């Protein structure tokens, strides 16, 4: 899937691309699903919920885009921690040239994050879908 991350120019585009990949795989999607509160009290909305219509297996996806310097990278550790409080498994999907090599390494090392270009095979494994 080379080139998909290059097509993403903003966070909303990343959400749309995640939904596009999930739909292609036959998964149901829900956007901005409200579930309780974050560790500091703010409302918690999961960017995208993916549901296998057959097994009902569910995955929450947080989408993080950073095109240049900015705050998305600084918020990642809190996002990873917040996923632990979700009532379902969760994953951070990230894209953009603004993530440093160190942050990419950190994200991948958590086992809770994947670059957009690697999302489809990851979802195939998670949901037990055919491996193409």
What are these regions (language model features)?
Residues 1-37:
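Acidic-basic catalytic patches of nuclease active cores, encompassing PD-(D/E)XK
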Residues 23-27, 87, 111:
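Glycine-centered loop/turn motif at secondary-structure junctions
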Residues 29, 90, 113-115:
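Hydrophobic beta-strand scaffold residues
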Residues 35, 65, 120:
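Active-site-proximal loop/turn and secondary-structure-junction residues that shape catalytic pockets
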Residues 9, 94-132:
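Domain-level recognition of nuclease-like catalytic cores that cleave nucleotide substrates
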Residues 58-59, 64-110:
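Catalytic cores of nucleic-acid endonucleases
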Residues 28-55, 70:
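Active-site metal-binding core of divalent-cation-utilizing nuclease and nuclease-like domains
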Residues 12-16, 43, 76-80:
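Short amphipathic alpha-helical segment that frequently serves as the phosphate-/nucleotide-binding helix
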